[in-house]
Amino acid sequence: MIAQGPSNGPFGGAPGPHIDPAVAAVIFDDFFSIHKNSSDEVDWLISAIQGTNTVECKTQYNGSGGELVLTSGTTTGDGDHMQWHHVGFKPLETLGRDIWFAAMVALSHIGVELGVGLANQNTDFSDTGLTNGIYFHRATDGTTTARARDGGDDEDTEISDPLSSAGVYCELGFHVTSAIATFYVNGSRVAEASAEIPWGTPLGPFVGLVTGGDAARAVAVDWIKVIQLR
């Protein structure tokens, strides 16, 4: 089993770069196109948190296409939650069943609430909408938390705002072993969690945004990748 390439942060020790499906389950989306639906089993499911919002693939910040852009409506609180339709990744207290997650994200404006990571359901990511997950949460004032949530109980670690500059991509990721979740920003370890990991709960990758002002604001996603050893 070949070790993962130069991204040593959240993917350190992961299988790859060419992953044998007998070794691990993997989702990788580079967003040159998107299959989406509001209710059926078509890749990404979209739930409106509030308002009329858009989800599309276009060139946003990196100049070469292949970017997913979620744009809110123009009223404070407008936004979407987007999640993979099948929650197929399960944190396990079993050696050798590790999970690796990362996403490359950027904000069009710093006044955005953002959620990105793994969660148990396609619903409002803000406040108490999600009952189980492992993810990053960023409030509209920039307060950013590395969070493990189990049955609505949180283990939060506040970290420096990694998205304090609009239009700049940042890699947010984590590695979950049989005992601990370690969070990374641009490959550097920033937090750990162990008390509220939702052991045994099926999770799926998600991205969500809410605008913090009466203006359309967006989150761009260059790519998302999830791996779990079988």
Task: Identify the meaning behind each predicted range.
Residues 31-32, 221-226:
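Extracellular beta-strand elements of beta-rich domains used
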Residues 149-171:
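Short, aromatic/His-centered strand-loop micro-motif at the edge of beta-sheets
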Residues 2-48:
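Extracellular carbohydrate-recognition regions
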Residues 39-69:
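Extracellular glycan-recognition surfaces and repeat-rich motifs
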Residues 193-223:
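Flexible glycan-contacting loops in extracellular carbohydrate-active proteins
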Residues 185-188:
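Short strand-turn-strand beta-turns centered on an Asx-Gly dipeptide
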Residues 72-144:
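Secretory/extracellular carbohydrate-interaction modules
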Residues 168-182:
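Localized edge beta-strand/strand-to-loop motifs within extracellular or lumenal beta-rich domains
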